[in-house]
Design a protein with these regions (language model features):
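C-terminal and inter-domain tail/linker signature
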Residues: 1-142
């Protein structure tokens, strides 16, 4: 595994699976940008902003675990395909805690410079999450 692939694995293991907030500061460049990661598709700017998002997400979901299925590294970027499982244990976007164990799939790309995350893109199945929480009906083919 290359250096950037190892870095993206470390990020997801320590930040999400282990809940280590200190890893956010250690691995993020102060000017890092997470494109489209905040509420309503807004960008996350810097580690402090990411920590606000991360704390809110972790207050809504407990027992978070990410399994990484595939990893690709090319140049200064690493990409993973993952599945996140968690328990809906706190309010989330106006949805009262359901206690349900839910699972979502996603893909993440991180760009590194001098060993730090400088840009990140995450796409995950938010519709599936809302369906599992009972917030929207399951889509039906017509």
């Amino acid at each position: 595994m290359g250096e950037n692939a190892a870095r993206i694995h470390k990020w997801f293991e320590e930040v999400w699976n282990q809940g280590r907030e200190a890893t956010i500061d250690a691995m993020c460049d102060p000017n890092a940008i997470g494109y489209g990661q905040a509420q309503h598709g807004a960008n996350i700017n810097g580690p402090e902003h990411f920590k606000q998002f991360w704390r809110a997400f972790r207050s809504a979901f407990s027992n978070i675990h990410i399994d990484i299925h595939d990893t690709v590294e090319q140049g200064d970027r690493a990409v993973i395909r993952w599945t996140m499982t968690m328990v809906h244990s706190g309010p989330f976007v106006g949805i009262a805690p359901t206690g349900k164990r839910v699972s979502v799939d996603g893909i993440s790309i991180q760009r590194f410079a001098e060993g730090k995350i400088v840009e990140a893109w995450d796409k995950w199945d938010q519709l599936s999450l809302l369906v599992q929480l009972g917030a929207v009906p399951e889509p039906k083919l017509v």
